[in-house]
Amino acid sequence: RVLIVKVSSLGDVIHTLPAVTDAQRARKDIQFDWVIEENFAEVPSWHPAVENVIPVALRRWRRNIFKTYMNHEFRAFKRELQGVHYDLVIDAQGLIKSGFISRLSKGLTIGLSNRTIREPMATLFYNKVYSVPWTEHAVDRVRQLFSRALQYEYDPDEIDYGIDVSRIDASSSIGEKAGKQVVFLHGTTWKTKHWPEDYWRHLAHISTQAGYKVLVPWGTPEEKLRAESIAQGNERVEVLGKQTLSGLANYIQQSDGVIAVDTGLGHLAAALNKPTVSLYGPTNPGLSGTFGNNQLHLNSSLNCAPCVKKVCTYSGPGVTEEYAGSSFAVTPPCFASHGPIEVWQQFESLLGKS
């Protein structure tokens, strides 16, 4: 019996699923429990190898530590965590917070070495460590960690997230699909990762002219305003109501394909094996992009990308020859590389190959 500690974020959680599939295939007797942030607790339950999901509320608890202590919520979590003695505890995240949770549980703790994780101090909580190069994609890094900790081999060319769609919450049913549909995943974290709003509106027009209905989800008030702006004046664009992860998974599963920025929901689309065009400006998809079949990454051709910065510091003229002398009509300028017409052409091409 193995405990996985991977508490967040959505993309990181989804990156762990292929390793769970590998282990299940190699070790038929294996059973996983999983500690995860309460907002993402639906995801592990979709995998048949995960027996128990243990929600943790670190994000919420940090906002009021005194209240958390007084209402005994942390003590209840600790009691559940320590209710089982695990054969192995794998910290698949490599942060101090995940290392602390790993040590708090009962079992031999495993993690990545201090030279190969984001917060090296986390290794103080481990009994044993393994080194996996930073140059590997996040999915491969977790797969290697699991295979070495549990002593099995896997085929790196075969990728299976193992999601059983019948386990996705049936109460989030969305009805029958009517015609062709594409999902726009426009919401993300950093300002620099946002594709220009005008581009989304133009892309929505192209999509509906091609006979597609466009579905636009949102998660925050700011994202809702952007979704409504994308849909403005176009009856074939539907701004979805507030959804659970299960609801979003159902919409993605039912669609013909997805167009996304660098966002956790893009990784969900990849896990559901849905054709997805992902747009990358300041980030590097080679290390943490959508991973799997039917995935296409459109990277910026600016030579300052990927800068991995939350604030754009571009001041020109350090650009590739293709854009030398351009003033850039969009912000951030790295997204000038891929406009709506090209994105739609690439999307249709991907659908044709899938």
Predicted regions and their residues:
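Catalytic machinery of carbohydrate-active enzymes
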Residues: 1-354
